[in-house]
Amino acid sequence: MAEDYLTDSASILSEAKAAKEMGRHHRAIRLSQESLELTLKAILRSVGVEYPKEHDVSDAIEENLEKFPEWIRSVTSKLEEGSTWLSERRGTSMYGDEIAGKPASQLFTSEDSAKAVEYASHAVEVARRLFDEMFRTA
């Protein structure tokens, strides 16, 4: 299942990159969040952790560091940061700011979408390396 999650996550990331290129920054953020969330859940599942049923799984990554290879521990802070940053923007990237009456398309910039895509891309790269080590060398 973990490998299937990663395949789906990479596909979603491609959609996020396309949305960014089209200037649909809110969509790039939403899709990047979905990609990163699914990637982190794949990483957790790959080491036998049943992930929490929530969007930000950064705490679960932190709580299970000992289950990961040493190299991945050096990059978990960026994974956790991305998970938190994207999760905080998940709702507004979809629905906008209902109190202010602003649609999602008016809330985010190209810098925001670039940051979102970078977080998701980094997570996919980390997961691919981990999976290559775990599943293809066994």
Which residues does each predicted region cover?
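Terminal alpha-helical segments
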Residues: 1-138
